[in-house]
């Protein structure tokens, strides 16, 4: 029997330790990512902000639950982490102008863009960094999707990463060069953006 008092107080009926958290989205068509999209990250890297979004991809199969183990590949000696805000698309859209991009956004979640730096930043794979970004388990995500209506200001959210209890990244979405609706509109110029597609919005400063 469910304790109504627990539900009313917003407490979990099932202890958190008794469940396995899955990624909030498990079936999708595309997993598009955006590089160099925080002004602080550009400064950190010593590069100028891009004139247009820098788009790359991961594979949808890279997504794992927020507490699942990341497999460290034996072919890499430099696996790194990047905290990301994630756009969850709610409906099909194609060839949008930037003012229409907001209409296709269902909500947001969070992810880690795990990266093998020695495959991303080298001449391996012909200089393309797909393999450095898209090895198995390289996208822990979730656990929840927050609808856009529930967020007061998407352009003023804290984005942080802790590693073994130490804070490693501390940024804010106010630093985004290209805003979520602009990213959705930009990607829609090239490919059909479907419901439950995902866009990952770059790395914050370390």
Give the positions of each predicted feature.
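N-terminal non-catalytic cap/leader segment that marks the start of a structured domain
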Residues: 1-53, 149, 160
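Catalytic-pocket segment enriched in acidic/His residues
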Residues: 11-15, 41, 117-206
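Short, charged beta-turn/beta-strand-edge "cap" motif at the junction between a beta-strand
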Residues: 38, 92-94, 204-206
């Amino acid at each position: 029997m469910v304790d109504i008092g627990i539900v009313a107080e917003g407490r979990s009926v099932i202890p958190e330790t008794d469940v396995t958290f899955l990624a909030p989205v498990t079936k999708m068509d595309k997993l598009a990512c955006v590089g160099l999209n925080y002004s602080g990250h550009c400064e950190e890297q010593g590069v100028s902000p891009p004139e247009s979004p820098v788009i790359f991809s991961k594979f949808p199969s890279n997504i794992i639950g927020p507490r699942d183990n990341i497999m460290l590949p034996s072919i890499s000696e430099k696996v790194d982490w990047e905290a990301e805000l994630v756009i969850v698309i709610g409906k099909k859209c194609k060839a949008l102008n930037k003012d229409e991009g907001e209409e296709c956004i269902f909500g947001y979640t969070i992810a880690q863009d795990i990266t093998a730096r020695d495959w991303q930043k080298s001449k391996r794979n012909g200089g393309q960094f797909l393999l450095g970004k898209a090895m198995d388990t390289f996208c822990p995500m979730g656990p929840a999707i927050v609808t856009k209506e529930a967020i007061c200001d998407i352009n003023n959210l804290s984005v942080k990463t802790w590693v073994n209890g130490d804070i490693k990244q501390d940024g804010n979405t106010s630093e985004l060069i290209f805003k979520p609706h602009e990213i959705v509109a930009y990607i829609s110029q090239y490919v059909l953006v479907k419901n439950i597609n995902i866009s990952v919005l770059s790395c914050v400063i370390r």
